Amino acid sequence: MANSLRNVNDYDPFKYRPSYFDLEAPTESFALGKFVDAIEVKQMALDAFSESSMVSIATSQLPKTAYTATSFIESEYYSFPYLFNDQKYYWDYFDYKIPAADFAVLELELDLNNQQDQQIKDHFIDPAIKAYKQLGDSTGLFATKPLTEYQNDTHYLLGYPVVPTDHTQLWECKQGAERFSYGYFYSNMARLTKNLRQGDPNAGSKTHIEYSNELLDKDSMDQGIVRFSTFLGANINYHDYDYRQQGYGLTLTDTNLPGGSSGSLVFNQDKKISSIYSAATESDSVGYAQLLRTPRDVNGISVVSQSYDLIFGDSNTKRYYAMFAKKQQTHLYSEILKSTDEQYRYVVDKQFN
């Protein structure tokens, strides 16, 4: 979503890239969508997504890009072996690519004098705040643990698949509400997960990155954990720059969700956010989620080649979300100031340009 947002009033450096904006029209509207209340997701899937199952409403203003996980660590190199004339060579494919992770945060300003924005607050924002408080209302919402411990977790993917919204309506507004429509393109969208669409001739749509199963070897995946720097095809173009995905992720079975699901939060059984759903493999059998926090070591033992913390930062992470939270004095930063746990307070004494 952050890559498709072209808001000329966005924060620097996201608002202007000459060749990018010359080729693409700016974003003119932005909408939030959700399932209507009291409808069972599974039943909706079996009903092939009736048009009344999802509703959406346009915001009065376009969002801004608060944070993207770009240039967040030093570039990690990985050499691929190959044979030529029976000689073995090593090829480093990534020396010119900027590191990136599939994680971004958008900021949306609401004008509560606007009826549509007030409805968004009532029906989208307030329920999210309520859920956040029920989960602890604290920095402890974001999981961090040794990579090997994730294999014992149960993972819950939040968010919603894309469904057609041509004839649905959210709330009656006197002035009317211009809603985003996906049109006929998604009229035959496949269902939620593979187990719900068995027998369907359509395997479903994949998100914006595809990974080859040929690279799922012992060097790239171990007990459900993947090291993105080993993936030859994990390249991303964002605002006219070439990036490659780095860091660590989860490999999740039966999670080839339809396009639009990328960016959904992944929780574990402890109700903590561990990662962001990213993409599916070419075979549609395995999905990936980008881990947000990977500790440098556990009990003094190094467990990763490169640690990073996209939320709170650490000595190895150059850009992280808490930098924006500190600059804007957000609620998260006030929670960081209250905490005595050093894993959250890295940003407090840091000075930024």
UniProtKB/Swiss-Prot annotation:
| Pfam families linked | Peptidase_S7 (PF00949)
Molecular function GO terms recorded: ATP binding; RNA binding; RNA helicase activity
* Name of protein: Uncharacterized protein MPN_591
Would you identify the family this protein belongs to, as annotated? Belongs to the MG067/MG068/MG395 family.
Q: Which InterPro entries match?
A: Flavi_NS3_S7, Uncharacterised_MG067
Highest taxon of the source?
Bacteria
Q: Tell me which species this is from.
A: Mycoplasma pneumoniae (strain ATCC 29342 / M129 / Subtype 1)
